[in-house]
Amino acid sequence: CIQTLGHLMKTLRWGYANDMKDDPDVLLIDEEKTYVFIEAMIKKWRTLCKTDKIHIGMDEAEGVGLGEYFNRHGYCDRYEIMLRHVQRVNDIAAKYGFKPMMWSDMFFKIGSKKRDYYDLNAEILPSLSEKIPTDASLVYWDYYHHDVELYKTMLKKHKEFGRNIIFAGGAWLWRGLCPHYDKTFDTTLKALSACDDEQIKSVIATMWGDDGGEVSRYTMLLGLQLFADYSHCDKLNVENTKENFKLCTGYDADAFIALDFDNIQAKKKDALATSKQVFYQDVLLGLFDKNFAEYDLEGYYDGIIDKLGALSNQGDIEYLFEYYRYLAKILKKKCHIGVKIRRAYNANDIDELLKCADVLSELSDDYKEFYKKLCSVWNRENKLFGFEVFEERIGGMLMRFKSCGEKIIKYCRAETERIDELDEEILWYGDENSKGELLSEHFYNNMRVF
């Protein structure tokens, strides 16, 4: 699975790509250097694998035709531009013996007045859809919806292209620090029910690694079992999948479900990143503290600790459960520390502030130990590349624990008149509709104030 149009910002930022990018994230269509680049990728993959299947991507290329392409050619029909590109890439794939599949969203977005993939009123012109190569499969990706009828309607609209249709659903582990089984089960059961009704023969389970890929792939084995069951079960249900999971792996399905820390009964259905927000938010700036204060998160994480503590040794994956037991203890200790610090500061409660400073010192030690456990999990499952992201993030947290603790102690000793961060009013995270809610924000950069 590669990208041959968008999602290429990390490589297009380098100088070699200056002549072949439409915008910072999207390749420049009709530029010959673009196709030399794409052919080099596909040729390399031909030497690395035996399969005849290749996913050529092309999703979320929102800027296609609107950047350097526009500068060179003026505004052109973006559908026509896309189709020319698809044909060129398809021909390259065929040259190396591959049968390509591609994401379908750009065809819907271009045909939607709202530029919305899931716009049921998007116009797909037969005269254009007929130009999609007949041997290219279209992949409908949808990880979000909880409505069988919506999935069925979208599948029917895909069939209008007259090409082989594949469905890609989500085995959710790309938000927060934990797998998301509640979301996975509900979306997948409904999506695959629709696929069954619409006679879709091929499905894909995606496990994206957004924002660093913090969650172990092995925590989502049970989700993969649910997708696997689609190939041989008449009707899917979670209880049957649990039995099949035990049969196939020997593992306890309920133990895996217990790792879903973020299945908090909040007003917002997709409050999926609380663990990550708690772990990374600054203890004095309190970006999420006003939202967190509405919930007994300490009690919630205490329940998680009890639940995981009651699980017997999980054999060769016990290392994962040891990691999550430790994470739960950190989250319990840290979830309301910012609220407590601010409350004590506003009340000029010096004794309580000093206790909070001690907690920050404890958290510093806890994060150092957590780093060791995270390193162990990562090295079991991944190459080393990418782990530097967590070293930088956790290293930054350690420096802030030290700095914030020192500020509190200096204030308590009357060595300074104020703590500037605590003199500022904290706000609700999000918009007016987010008051009192836990939120799904999961990007690290959006957990920083500056």
Language model regions located:
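Solvent-exposed, flexible loop/coil residues
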Residues: M9-L12, E31, A136, D147
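Short, well-ordered, mixed-charge alpha-helical segments that flank or form enzyme active sites
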Residues: G6-M9, G63-G65, I110-G111
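Substrate-binding groove of N-acetylhexosamine-processing glycoside hydrolases
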Residues: Y35-K43, T47, T51, N71-F450
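Secreted glycan hydrolases and related glycan-binding modules that recognize and/or cleave
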Residues: I2-L5, W14-A17, G169-A171, L247-T249
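Short connector loops/turns at beta-strand edges and beta->alpha or beta->beta junctions
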Residues: A17, D59-G63, R163
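Glycine-rich, aromatic-flanked loop segments that form ligand/cofactor-binding clefts
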Residues: C1-G15, K50-K53, T206-D210
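Active-site groove signature of glycoside hydrolases
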Residues: T4, D22-D25, D30-R72
